[in-house]
Amino acid sequence: MKRHHHSVFPRAPRTAPCRACASAVAIASLLGLPRVALADDALPSKSTTDAAPAGAAGSAKLAGSGGAAQALPAISVGAARAAADAGNLSKPAGTGSRLGLSSLDTPASVETLDGERIRERGDTSVLDAVTRAAGFAANAAPGNGGTSVSVRGFSGPESITTLYDGTRMLVGAGTVTFPVDTWSVERIEVLRGPASVLYGEGGLGGVINVVPKAPRRERETSLLVGAGSYGQKRVALDTTGALGPMLSYRFHVNDDRQNGWVPRGESHLSSVGGALKLDVNPSLSFTLDYDFARQKPMAYFGVPVIDGVLDPAMARQNYNVGDASIAYYDRWARLNTTWRAAPGITVRNQFYGMLTDRHWRDSESYALQGDGSVLRSDYIEIRHHERQVGDRLDTTFDGHLLGRQNRLVVGAEFNDVSFVDTSNTPFDGQSVVPAFGFDPGSFSSPDATVPVFRTHTRQAGVFAEDRIELSDRLSWISGLRYDYIDYQRDTFATPSSPASSFSKTFAHTSWRTGLVFSLTPDISLYGQYTTGTDGVGSLITLSKSSSAFNLSTGDQWEAGFKQAFAGGRGAWTLAFYQIVKRNLLSVDPQNPGQTIQVGKQSSRGVEWTGAFRLGHGISIDANAAFLRARYDDFNESVDGASVSRAGKVPINIPQQTANLWLDWAFAPGWRAGAGLRYVGRSYGDTANTVPLASYTLLDASASWRATKDLTLSLYLHNLTNRVYVETSQNSGSEWLLGAPRSGGVTATLKF
């Protein structure tokens, strides 16, 4: 969970951009090769601004990077589906496939969270929004960037892939810091289950894709000001419109700061971004996007506990040093091109560059002593510098195969990543403070902060997906991806060790196959089998001790049912799955001092989602997930002896989650909502001796449209003021608690 475990999670160098990638992009742009967006927005990108329902009478929409929509032969089963789509089942589900299929036509568990509804509920962070989706639970800590979640029995940035506009930054040192806020979000799509066949290594548990708002030709501006508990102050702006007959724009800015709910808990988030879209003609469009975010999150690493018992008086304490500092700086740039080359042929290209700089300087480990004092250790200073340049090109072919309607996507992706780690390893330094009423002191370490290592990773992948209609009701969807990764790590000399280098290559193939049977135009049954891979740590910061091992592998069986009913005013889904992950690192039972790659972990479960528009302004969204996650073959070294953890629940994995949200537009211009969020019991250690109690949170919101342009809103979170553990670290001896009761008000002006 911590990004500073240098033996497993390193950090790497800054390198020059991949010239081959840049050349490829230049050629692609000259040829008009682009980033395809298909019927109902094939890709998980903001290209879909006005996509038609997947079953829209014989034709679908091609929207290129926010570009002009064009008619395409529809890939859907049966007659047109209702436009009122309560569960988003008939809308694009690009994160689950590059084929431009709706959720009803995709043999996978996908869910779409609408950006407007996210903001209406007061969920200002991506983490808060995503954990209202079925099966997702927060696992966030400053060490992983404050973004980590769990789903389907797996957790962390390596197993749950995060995308922005369909693209991911490769994970370094177990840390992902972007995207974070929801002000500029059009929608968030989630895919539950392995996704290596779509996005490469990682993502065995699932995928989160944050899709930002795209430029529109209709002029609209939104201005928000707000204030809330713990000194919160917020201001945000979003504007879009046309700049001529061919050019449109979008610009957004957001600033959110507060004092925090623990001493010295200040935080500050600023983000700014924009996009320009050029519609050259109805067949060709370009979109240039740029996003920048600066975060200074709360420097809080939790409170110490003994034997899983929390002293309530310590719940709002902060044991970090007085001058602790955490900062993340992220910059993302993307050039999207969409070209309708010929009837039935669409080409898409995305050229992208990402840069992140991160800094931690604090004390992160706390232990209660016999006299009631707190021992602080792990005086850590770490800097990450990561740079990634890449390009993704794919082409979609619509036609017929053996007389049946067929859609094929083929493509390739390239990434060049450099990473530099600077730190004060081995993180010595400690202090003792009273549990209450103490001087937090300042950061002091006997170890100098110096460059430790750099890495250079080159990744290349080719992929293909196909959908063929075997009959009017039955379709077969399949996919294949091959990835090759070349990795090099250079460790700098220190007073205690000489310089060293090593290199490693990985090659892996992922695939999936599935069937969808349409009982009616609004009811589908599906089944699928998928394979995937996970690194034994963060792949681009692989340590020497882990270099002897291969990627972990996994596979999933899934079957499910999806239905829209009542003219689209209701929808529900049901999914059953089993995932098995193999080749985990495990202690050798015969030699506890040696690690071998033989471990196995599995999970199986059931997930249900429902959305209902009941009339009279009442709507309900609900979901529930139940799973059984276990280590099947896993050993740890305890006091020099090998101890089996077979049958134990993996750390920080709740076995049940559920969400409920009720909205009521009870009068013209008035709306009220309330929601429950339930997270079941989990464990803070692999021996399952430190249980983390289940919890239920109650949130509420209300809004009044005072005038045509002005809306006033109220948001309340954790109304019962529940003290709960969001995640744990250090084998369950340190608990990071969730936020207490809070509230806020906003005024939003649209013109």
Model-derived features: where do they sit?
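Periplasmic plug
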Residues: 112-115, 120, 127-132, 149-194
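Outer-membrane beta-barrel translocator/receptor signature
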Residues: 171, 183-186, 197-274, 280-284, ...
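Acidic/polar loop-and-plug regions of large Gram-negative outer-membrane beta-barrel proteins
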Residues: 256, 260, 273-340, 350-386, ...
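Structural signature of Gram-negative outer-membrane beta-barrels, strongest in the C-terminal barrel
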Residues: 279-281, 386, 405-407, 413-415, ...
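Surface-exposed extracellular loop regions of Gram-negative outer-membrane beta-barrel proteins
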Residues: 294-309, 418-420, 486, 516-558, ...
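Membrane-embedded beta-barrel scaffold of Gram-negative outer-membrane proteins
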Residues: 336-340, 345-364, 524-526, 551-635, ...
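Gram-negative outer-membrane beta-barrel transporters
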Residues: 578, 597-686, 720, 750
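C-terminal beta-signal and adjacent terminal beta-strands/loops
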Residues: 678-685, 703-751
